[in-house]
Amino acid sequence: MGSVVPEAINKLSAVHDNLRSDNPEDWSNAVHSCRRILQDLADAIYPAREDKVIDAGGKPKTIKLGKDNYINRIVAFVEERSASERFSHIVGSHLGFLGDRLDSVFQAAQKGSHDVIVSQVEADRYVVYTYLTVGDVIGLL
């Protein structure tokens, strides 16, 4: 991971420290760091670019690939690099779930809801999902 996203190593260290805390605010910080790690990964492997249009069952579908569309960019990378359609589908599904949840946590925090992460176990779960997903993606390099 360090060779692809060097700054992720420091972020993962901070995530680990935050998860060891008894403070729910630290758990939220750990989850926010997961979002930033995925954003950094997207920037490293599939920088923002113009949207692309794909054929989705005979209908054109626009895939947004801008700066804020970090999950779409990682999914596009996986789809372009993976020889296995099933692998692409599984990783894409995990990324979709994880990205939606991390973005929801982030948006709630922006609105002042500080109790979004209610347990250390929940925070641990997002960190593990992030770590495994990043590993799957980096494995395609």
Which ranges hold each PLM region?
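Long, contiguous internal "core" modules enriched in hydrophobic/ aromatic residues
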Residues: 1-4
